[in-house]
């Protein structure tokens, strides 16, 4: 764009120089025509017309020159503005390049952080998947163990119920046997007590008889026999007492 403006300016300057040269030639011709006006009256009108045309052309050229100067001034101002704009553009471009560099660095840093974060998350996900698989295996094994334990507990419960029933039946039978034995021993005890009372009565009678017949040998033997029976009954009575106490 600047090269085009320079070319236009050079073209205008060249045209201006040419016009100026034409203007000087025209003035010279006018002077020549004026000096020869007395001689060449026949050509005066033509020269006047030419002069008029030249004046008009001169005015036109002046206007053109003025416009060219204005354009040149505008172009100079435009060049100055363009230079300022170029400087501003360069500054903005430099700032943009700096910002782009910072932005690229920031993006690269964010990308690296993102990559690192993604890798960490992927590692955590893999670890969690492995842990989940392990937990699933443990849960399956525990469920199998729980099922097996439930079956074992049910079997043991049934077995325990059966054993309890058997033990209860056994103990009921043993208790009934013990009750029967106790009743029998109680009956024996009562019988022995009755016998003991009878023997005590006999002993009392025997003692009375012995007192009357102290010298009677037969009575002595009877007393001795009664004593032995009494001792035997006492021993049996003690044995029954111990049995009853232990029962």
Swiss-Prot record:
Interacts with viral tomato spotted wilt virus (TSWV) movement protein NSM, which is involved in cell-to cell spread of viral genome and enlargement of the host plasmodesmata size exclusion limit (SEL). The keyword Endoplasmic reticulum applies. GO terms for biological process: intercellular transport; intracellular transport. This is Protein At-4/1. It is found in: Endoplasmic reticulum; Cell junction, Plasmodesma. One of its GO terms (cellular component) is endoplasmic reticulum. The C-terminal part of the protein in required for plasmodesma localization. It comes from Arabidopsis thaliana (Mouse-ear cress). Keywords: Cell junction, Coiled coil, Endoplasmic reticulum, Host-virus interaction, Transport. Its main location: endoplasmic reticulum. Involved in intra- and inter-cellular trafficking through plasmodesmata (PD). Expressed in leaves (at protein level). Residues 39-126, 182-247 form a coiled coil.
